[in-house]
Amino acid sequence: PSLSFRLRAALMIGRLAASASRLAGKGSGSSIRGKVTLALAPQAFPELIAPRQIAAVTGTNGKTTTTHFLTAAVHASRGIEPDDIVTNADGANLHAGIVSALGQAPEARNAILEVDERVVADVVRQGHPRVLVLLNFSRDQLDRNHELTFLGREWREALEEAGEEGPTVVANAADPLIVWAAQAAHRTVWVDTKPRWTADSVLCPQCGSILLHDDNGWRCEECGLHQPEADWWVDDRKAMRKDGHEYELEISVPGSFNLANATCALAAATEMGVDPYDALLGMREVSSPACSANMVSSAIETAKATDEFLMMFIASLVSGG
């Protein structure tokens, strides 16, 4: 994509800031690179994201692993060159992290992005993704309940606005809030991730009534919202498809939850035109990526120093020093 002069200059200065941050021992420089770029070129996010073929992955849990799976699956495709794919699978998933990743590969025509829940609507509106993977909404803190409902509404509105130009959504059929948001998409591929999200799914996101749960899934008897029939589902260590195909996952990443993540990634890769067997070859090479807890502990240690360094760096630019 052709970048504006302002953005090219901002990216160059962002790279200098990242190098200076590393030399000063303030972290990897990824965060400050994106922050400096956005500070100097406020339109960097839409300008960098819009010209590409985007696949985005979001959810409270599992998005880093699923992004790794999907990236490996697409890398294994015979139709896409490795240098033509950029990803932020290190977990830097807010605006600055996405800008930082995309700015390092401005010529790559394909992007596979891990996206924080708060950034999804912007990605849909400004990036026009080809595929959007919606994993789950987990109310891991009581005060997040209202926030998640608001975000679900925001996703739904963005998908409604996108209409037929919007993404194919690969969505977790077992999560009522995900289903309610994803129903607004012009095309949805439903994945039953098995265990049911009953602990997080008491009230209907559409009408507020109490949801009923049984062996067939969940449903609301007041408004009719219910768990949709799955196009893909997990059975033991296999990904099952509605058309009768079965795929042995044989992934290296431990944990039953990651079988669901792998199935979502496989469904998304298939929607992107990747042969499922090629996708699986790539996915089986994925080892356990850095989990969110590890990244959080590192971020806590460097965030304050990084922000202070950013302020000093921008101040020096403004003053000409």
Give, region by region, the residue ranges found by the protein language model.
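Low-acidity, Ser/Thr- and Arg-rich intrinsically disordered low-complexity segments
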Residues: 291-298, 302-309, 316-319
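Thr-Gly-centered strand-to-loop micro-motif
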Residues: 88, 252, 301
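Exposed boundary/loop context
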Residues: 27, 52-55, 248, 296, ...
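N-terminal Lys/Arg-rich, disordered targeting/topogenic segments
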Residues: 1-3
